[in-house]
Amino acid sequence: MNLSNHFLVAMPDMEDAFFSQSVVYICKHDEDGALGIAINKPSPITMDMIFSATGKNIPFRMQHDSVMMGGPVQVERGYVVHTPIGNWQSSIGVSDNIALTSSRDVIENISREGAVDKILISIGYSSWGKGQLERELADNAWLTVPADEHILFDIPYEHRYAAAFAKLGIDPLALFSGAGHA
């Protein structure tokens, strides 16, 4: 099972302070573990603040967009999920059209026409060690669904959790992750 380019959708009763009601975009999943970016947890940082620090112009449409809190790992670093893949210093291809980049060159070129089409910037990322995500899935902590670019880039972050459940065709209020006992 490879969950790269999938969403993890937290079960409604997840109690973890960070991951409660999270949608995590899985960028890499292999036998060594998984890496993802939470796409619906805003940080206090805006895109305008990021671009002001680089001295580059930000496309007006992104000016007030929130930077996501991608996860609790390496929160001092920025990560960019974007289309198209492009040719950046430190990127991993997630799908045929989406990449995760951690190098500054992608930020410095966003204002350049055609450098990136769609973008989600986060600070930090989410990580699971070998077998950890599989155990959490077996424990019914998460649901999975193939990623959807519309949810990832176009839907406001505060609606992404509901949109991921809608893609699954499930009402989150009807779910309970605990096993039944007779």
Swiss-Prot record:
Pfam families per record: DUF179
Superkingdom in the source lineage: Bacteria
GO cellular component term, pick one: cytosol
Family: Belongs to the UPF0301 (AlgH) family.
Protein name, as recorded: UPF0301 protein NMA1550
Organism for this UniProt entry: Neisseria meningitidis serogroup A / serotype 4A (strain DSM 15465 / Z2491)
